[in-house]
């Protein structure tokens, strides 16, 4: 947090303290540590997030998440929040040799600052622990700027194979 000005550091500390005050514990699981029950919960929360946002179920299927869990576990991590040992929220990350990519998140209910804890602060910690030099927390959101993320130009290229 060295590059974050004083009032922002104070805000981050306050937000993180609020997580503890809500009796929320967060664990970051990697690859095969993410069991089928957590994946199932994650997908339910993913759908819930999209339903709230735009009335859809999201554009990725449960089969997609099952497939990536099997085929690329070494590039996946998930921050899971627990309250009284019950999982209540998840944030999915992908990573390569130098970059962490934060992409999807969901929660069973609204909790103060939990989105920031899972999607930003735990991601930053994970990236540091893994020696990753960049954290791409995704597009949009002015709330990211005051938490230390600077806007950058991003290029994206996708190839979607169709079986026909």
Give names to the regions the model predicted.
Residues 1-112, 158:
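A conserved beta-strand-loop-helix scaffold within acyl/acetyltransferase catalytic domains
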Residues 97-159:
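Acyl-donor binding region in acyl/amide transferases
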């Amino acid at each position: 947090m060295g590059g974050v000005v004083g009032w922002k550091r104070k805000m981050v500390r306050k937000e993180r303290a609020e997580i503890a005050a809500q009796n929320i514990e967060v664990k970051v699981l990697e690859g095969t540590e993410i069991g089928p029950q957590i994946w199932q919960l994650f997908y339910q929360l993913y759908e819930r997030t999209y339903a709230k946002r735009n009335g859809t179920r999201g554009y990725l299927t449960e089969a997609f998440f099952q497939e990536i869990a099997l085929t690329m576990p070494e590039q996946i991590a998930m921050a899971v929040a627990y309250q009284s040992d019950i999982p209540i929220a998840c944030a999915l990350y992908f990573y390569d040799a130098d970059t962490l990519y934060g992409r999807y998140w969901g929660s069973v209910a609204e909790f103060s600052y939990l989105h920031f804890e899972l999607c930003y602060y735990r991601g930053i910690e994970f990236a540091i622990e893994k020696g990753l030099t960049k954290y791409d927390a995704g597009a949009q959101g002015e709330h990211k700027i005051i938490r230390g993320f600077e806007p950058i130009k991003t290029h994206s290229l996708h190839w979607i194979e169709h079986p026909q």
